[in-house]
């Protein structure tokens, strides 16, 4: 038998309808499609018909890692989630990535990925423990936020367990629902949290004690060490060199096996402005334009705990609502006035900050689909524009959502002129786009291709 390096050799398949657990051979695909994204795209081609929608039981929720996952290679903690994505407008095959530690743990448990199909009769979660797999009842965690879900599953299975889960937004099939892992990382784009919810799948908990076999360990280790020395050098990115940036209450952190210190944790020991409980962690990927710093932090916590795509709310839904107010389509939600600037909104920076109370109300309504506004916005602005205000808000999407694809532009200027990636820096990305497996919406290489797609 040929020795396998990098891979474990098995992809887990869980049929929730039939309560059947099987595996398929990774190497059937790996030699031709290289990594988890390519393998999942091939499986989607074989198994997902054009008639399958995002919430159909026959949609596949594929969670994949690659041959480097679980090794010392920088960035090898990443995991990709793929399937027909409800956030896309219209729904189509897409993917979203997340960091953290869940991906390597899946590899250590003996699997190169998971294919989930069907729909459970009642809420369940999947428990993976060193190759042993069970489908267990989630009745006690259904309805919980993502943080409480992780805490509960760790109390059951042990503190060394890694968890991904959907929050109330996913359970309520919000098209902008995320899959959250622990406190700092999420598969934020695509709406895959709602795909979990549609399958009555609350979470996947995993623990593994295995390893990853490397063909030439010494050479590989030398390369990893060389890379680690180059990262923190004076010529490397500043984020790789600086750890603490604001004293004892804030600390930069990183995912497993990664040199980039791009996440942050904020410790707080004081009561929040409008939240009754205390919390410990701030998500640093996106920023809400809020009138107070504490409100901004609490909003990030709420979005992650509800399992909502905070990027979509901050950079898409709220600017669209402010544009709608400027065009006299709406003035308030539940008696709370929608803030909007006096001057026309041309760029994201022109938007008015919102109060913490307004944002907390909006996130709650989205997560639980409360009222006509909450129910519509739970699907994102592109879908909401078709339902609200007689469709008169659809033209206002043009500046925020390229081609109304369902996801707000990412990174390159956050819609409109003023992006910081220009010629010729995006040429390599254009070539990558030509052979990619997904749509050209947000976060396809940070949307640098948006400069040519128009």
Which residue ranges define each predicted feature?
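Extended C-terminal regions of large enzymes
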Residues: 56, 77, 154-157, 161-164, ...
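Basic, polar low-complexity surface loops/patches
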Residues: 1-253, 298, 305
